Amino acid sequence: MSEHVRSAGPPQASTAPSGGSAVHEVTSVGARVALVMAGGTGGHIFPGLAVAEALRERGWRVHWLGGRGNAGHPSMESQLVPPRGFAFESIDFSGVRGKGPLTLVFLPLRLLKAFWQSIQVVRRVKPDVVVGLGGYIAFPAGMMSVLLGKPLVLHEQNSVAGMVNKVLAGVADRVFTAFPGVFRKAEWIGNPLRPAFIRQPDPATRFAGRAGPLKLLVVGGSLGAKALNELVPRALALMPPAQRPDVTHQSGIRQIDELRANYAAAGVQAELTPFIEDTAQAFADADLIICRAGASTVTEIAAVGAAALFVPFPSAVDDHQTTNARFLVDQGGGWLLQQRDMSAAALADMLQKTDRSALLQCALKAKTMQKTDATTRVVAACEELAR
């Protein structure tokens, strides 16, 4: 999830090597070099950025390996990473699940091409350590990095390991996870997060003195969550106006017009936005958050210490969002509602029965569940392996 805007790093000159994507050349001499591999979704990219920024602060020269995108649509990482001042490398490879039989037929050729491109990148960048944070792009690059003798540090963000990390975990030098029990031999450290999530005041301090309508934050992510966009306005319309919360509803830019129409049709006032500038602050300000249960979202909410109603994305691979949410929900740190069980009447009833006292207790429970030193642990592993 996490579509918050981060500040860019120091500017660096740009060149375009033949046959490759734009690369920002870093001029520091003698620095240790890290190759960070992550792509596809914000759940992989934003933890990778947290690690990359921490490595840069420690004097490392950081290159990022991601995908180029397809069908005229650039990859998310190619849009997010270069503006933050990191050298960006790319190869041609993307997911295979749900793409049809032809994708599997041509997979061997695509893999060979991606293996060769990965070898070229690793030889050019000469990393002291390679850090993989998931996404299909990490498979060919991770395997070739190991083949070329480069130390590999792996981090799995979800409570159910993805296909790529299941394979790479067998050859990595260090394996970390955001949730417990993902791999038999791994270190549970939590998710790498920006410091802003960790530095928020504790829930008791934030809730002290709050009065009036509840503050409800609905988070749909970069693409929006159509089910939430349709259901929440209808649920609010069923509540007496005096009992309605103050609502901020974030949806992706592609769905913002439809979201405005939904609220207008329901006759409900709300602050509607295509993105959130400061997600950590928005989480801290909310009494209750309604959101999906991507790994970054769950761990960011826990780090802040916020109360959330999780509605897992029903098509998530291996239903990992449900497992992510249960990490908090089973300990009283949130609520879980499957999309198939959602109704406007049920949500309206829940909102009317919810008070700040219960939300504070939920937020306090969530806060106790999150480890907050994941970024430091990953950076320390990189420095140990690079010696």
UniProtKB/Swiss-Prot annotation:
Pfam family, one: Glyco_tran_28_C
One term of GO molecular function: undecaprenyldiphospho-muramoylpentapeptide beta-N-acetylglucosaminyltransferase activity
Region named Disordered: 1-22
Keyword Cytoplasm among record annotations: no
First-tier enzyme category under EC: transferase
Catalytic activity: di-trans,octa-cis-undecaprenyl diphospho-N-acetyl-alpha-D-muramoyl-L-alanyl-D-glutamyl-meso-2,6-diaminopimeloyl-D-alanyl-D-alanine + UDP-N-acetyl-alpha-D-glucosamine = di-trans,octa-cis-undecaprenyl diphospho-[N-acetyl-alpha-D-glucosaminyl-(1->4)]-N-acetyl-alpha-D-muramoyl-L-alanyl-D-glutamyl-meso-2,6-diaminopimeloyl-D-alanyl-D-alanine + UDP + H(+)
Bilayer topology annotation: Peripheral membrane protein
Pathway participation: Cell wall biogenesis; peptidoglycan biosynthesis
Listed CDD domains: GT28_MurG
Compartments in which it is found: Cell inner membrane
Keyword Chaperone recorded: no
GO-annotated cellular components: plasma membrane
Binding site residues for UDP-N-acetyl-alpha-D-glucosamine: 41-43, 158, 194, 222, 276, 321
EC number(s) stated in the UniProt entry for this protein: 2.4.1.227
Record keywords: Cell cycle, Cell division, Cell inner membrane, Cell membrane, Cell shape, Cell wall biogenesis/degradation, Glycosyltransferase, Membrane, Peptidoglycan synthesis, Transferase
Function: Cell wall formation. Catalyzes the transfer of a GlcNAc subunit on undecaprenyl-pyrophosphoryl-MurNAc-pentapeptide (lipid intermediate I) to form undecaprenyl-pyrophosphoryl-MurNAc-(pentapeptide)GlcNAc (lipid intermediate II).
Xref: PANTHER family: GLYCOSYLTRANSFERASE, UDP-N-ACETYLGLUCOSAMINE--N-ACETYLMURAMYL-(PENTAPEPTIDE) PYROPHOSPHORYL-UNDECAPRENOL N-ACETYLGLUCOSAMINE TRANSFERASE 1
Matches recorded under NCBIfam families: murG
Family membership noted in the UniProt record: Belongs to the glycosyltransferase 28 family. MurG subfamily.
Protein name, entry field: UDP-N-acetylglucosamine--N-acetylmuramyl-(pentapeptide) pyrophosphoryl-undecaprenol N-acetylglucosamine transferase
Species the sequence originates in: Polaromonas sp. (strain JS666 / ATCC BAA-500)
Gene symbol of the encoding locus: murG
